[in-house]
Amino acid sequence: MNGSSGQYTRGHQSEQVGSDADPAPNAQEGRFTSAEEVAEAELDVISEQGPVQPSHPWTRYVALGDSFTEGIGDPDETRPGYHRGWADRVAEALAEGTQNFAYANLAIRGRLIGQIRDEQIAPALELRPDLITLCAGGNDVIRPGGDPDETARTLDTMVQLLSTTGATIMLFNGPDVRETPVVGSIRGKVAIFNENVRTVAARHDAVVADMWSLRELTRPEMWDEDRLHFSPLGHHTIARMALETLNVGHNLEPLEPRPVPERSWREARVDDVVWARHHLFPWVARRLRGRSSGDGITPKRPNIEPLFGGSMPPGGGSIEES
C-alpha cells in the first residue's frame, strides 16, 4: 500500500468462503485489516491507474442474504452504523462507466434461509433486477441438526422464483472450515451444501462464486476479531473473486497484509478463551433465547438507487422503532 499506514502491500493473486456464523480459522490480534486502511489502498490504485470502466450488460443489481452480504465486519467510518462489504464494492465496480446503474441491498444480519425467502424475495422481484446475488443457508447449516439437503431445497425454490426475472443470478457456496477449531467438525456438511448449491445453480442457469476454493480466506487476516465475519480485507478479496466470476474488469488489486506475529500455544489458548467469552457464548445464548443479531434491523439499501463512483446515498442497517 502506498498510503500513510504502510500496513498493506500489493500482492499477486494467490490460490483461489460466508455467512453470519462461518468462524474464522485461528483468528488472532495483529491482523492489519482496518476498514480505513483497506479503503485507502483501494483509492491508491484508482488514483494511480484511473478507474476501470468495465463492459457488462447490467444496470439494476439487487443483493440478497445475511450479514455476509450486508457487509458486517467492514464498518464505514464515514457513515456510522453503515457496513460496506463485498457487495458494495461489486456495485461500485459495476457502476463505473455504466449510465443509470442502480443498486439495492436487502440483506440483514442473522437471517436464516427461510427468513431470507419470506422477507427478501418478493421485494427483490418488485425491483426488476437484471443482476441478483444470493448467499443464504450458512446460518442454517452451521446450527446443530442443520440439514444441508433441506436447506438446499429451500434455496432451490428461491432461485426458481428469482429466475422468473430473467436476471443473471450469482450464488455463493460456503468456506472450507477445515482449519477452524470450533466448527471444523461440520466441514462435511458444508461440502454437501456446496455441492447442492452447484446443483441448484446448474438447474437454473446461475453462476457460482466459489468461496470454498478461495484459499486466501483461510488466513486469519481475512476475518474480523469475532471470527464470525470477514474483515475489510476479506470483503475486498471476495469482491475481487465475485467480479472475476462475472468476468468484469475492476481496480481491486490483491492486498497483502503483514504476517500475523507467531504466538505460543499458551497465548493462542488464552486468546481462544477470551474470544469464546466475548463472541461465541453470546452468539450461542442468543440462539437459545430465539434472538438474532438482526432483530430490529432494516435493509441498508431497500430501494434500487444510483451510484456515483464510490459514493452512496445515506442509510444502512437502521433500527426499527417499536
What positions do the PLM features span?
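Serine-esterase "nucleophile elbow" of acetyl-processing enzymes
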Residues: 2-109, 121-128
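Structural beta-sheet core signal
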Residues: 63, 134, 170-172
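Oxyanion-hole/transition-state-stabilizing segment in secreted/luminal serine hydrolases
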Residues: 70-76, 99, 113-150, 177
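Charged helix-capping and loop-helix junction motifs
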Residues: 148-156, 187-194
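A short helix->loop->beta-strand "cap" motif at the edges of active sites that frequently abuts
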Residues: 164-169, 206
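Substrate-gating cap/lid alpha-helix
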Residues: 179-212, 232-235
